[in-house]
Amino acid sequence: MKRTIIMMLDSFGVGAAHDAEAFGDVGSNTFGHIAKACAEGKANDGREGPLKLPNLARLGLGHASKESTGEFPAGFGDDVEVIGAYGHADELSSGKDTPSGHWEMAGVPVLYEWGYFSELTNSFPQALTDKILARAGLTEFLGNCHSSGTVILDELGEEHMRTGKPIFYTSADSVFQIACHEESFGLEKLYELCIIAREELADYNIGRVIARPFVGTGPGSFERTGNRRDYAVEPPAPTVLDKLKAAGGEVVSVGKIADIYAHCGITKKVKATGLEALFDATLEQVKLAGDNTIVFTNFVDFDSHYGHRRDVAGYARSLEYFDSRLPEILALLDEDDFLLLTADHGCDPTWPGSDHTRERVPVLAYGAGLEAGSLGLRSSFADMGQSIASYFKLEPMEYGESFIR
């Protein structure tokens, strides 16, 4: 029985990419800087001491990081019996965003430039917002700027609730984000507004419109909910997910995977919110999975809760929780199964600002007849997609070199 389980640790980079200078990210290292802060006692909120990831270390995480940066992260070394194949990958895609990383690892790099709203204030063209408002039956909106999602709620959440004006904002990514209160504005109304925005953005080449529903009564109590939706453009070519689906296989999305791929190549969607629930849902879907199935989970909290918010201790806590549950996944694997752990970009919680960082990502592969040891530097995330295609004996992808023979 052939099954692939992909666990995407959203934003868990292992050191600056070869082209990090073009992004202002030379020296960024999500994993390494978290480990360093833990070793120095600077990440003791809700945990303490060195970063403890024994199961990820056995899969080769520390070794992959050393190959990427030239040194082991603090607290990691070669005194571990590695049971998996490990490597690190550079990105071909032009951006350091979520769709680019996900699509490329599924065999389809983004070799064109996304559109961006680069102005920090007055970020959106008035012609665009006028059309969105007119179609939605609204007259005004709030925001029109770059912001972190939690900051803008404290700044504008009360005014939004009082006036009913939606909050439009963006970031360094190719996104148009809309935040609205679930109760005072309404969840379905927010989704309808996002669909309108998605349609009106067709000429702007924006990767995603993101619905950001929240609850609460005032600054300090506002909280984003698990009802986020991403309205992405479709990948520019069929991914390995599409190819497996076309061949009669099953592709199970856990969490926001389906949204990231614009629901292309997905046969089943499982909703889950939060690290614990996402892990539980992954376990359940692996138990249910039959032959020729991909179970694909995005563990978004690493990025959204801790990377962007520059919360080193929170990131470390969540990594340690994730690591503690890995034996549950390993226990479910059959001899022929293929487990793949990776990331889509970096988001170094020690880095200035609140945006993603251009980093190499870990490639931790277990099963599928792979011998334990180094896979080296992969020149593209697409090597993972090509390897999945090879594993399922699908038609080869245009990009990537398989590490499964």
Curated annotation (Swiss-Prot):
Belongs to the phosphopentomutase family. It comes from the Bacteria. It catalyses: 2-deoxy-alpha-D-ribose 1-phosphate = 2-deoxy-D-ribose 5-phosphate; alpha-D-ribose 1-phosphate = D-ribose 5-phosphate. Pathway: Carbohydrate degradation; 2-deoxy-D-ribose 1-phosphate degradation; D-glyceraldehyde 3-phosphate and acetaldehyde from 2-deoxy-alpha-D-ribose 1-phosphate: step 1/2. The keyword Cell division does not apply. Gene3D superfamilies: Alkaline Phosphatase, subunit A, Phosphopentomutase. GO terms for biological process: 2-deoxyribose 1-phosphate catabolic process; 5-phosphoribose 1-diphosphate biosynthetic process; metabolic compound salvage; nucleotide metabolic process. GO terms for cellular component: cytosol. Its main location: cytoplasm. Mn(2+) 2 binds at D303, H308, H356. SUPFAM superfamilies: Alkaline phosphatase-like, DeoB insert domain-like. It comes from Shewanella pealeana (strain ATCC 700345 / ANG-SQ1). Its cofactor is Mn(2+). One of its GO terms (molecular function) is manganese ion binding. The gene is deoB. Isomerase that catalyzes the conversion of deoxy-ribose 1-phosphate (dRib-1-P) and ribose 1-phosphate (Rib-1-P) to deoxy-ribose 5-phosphate (dRib-5-P) and ribose 5-phosphate (Rib-5-P), respectively. Its EC number is 5.4.2.7. Binds 2 manganese ions. It is found in: Cytoplasm. This is Phosphopentomutase.
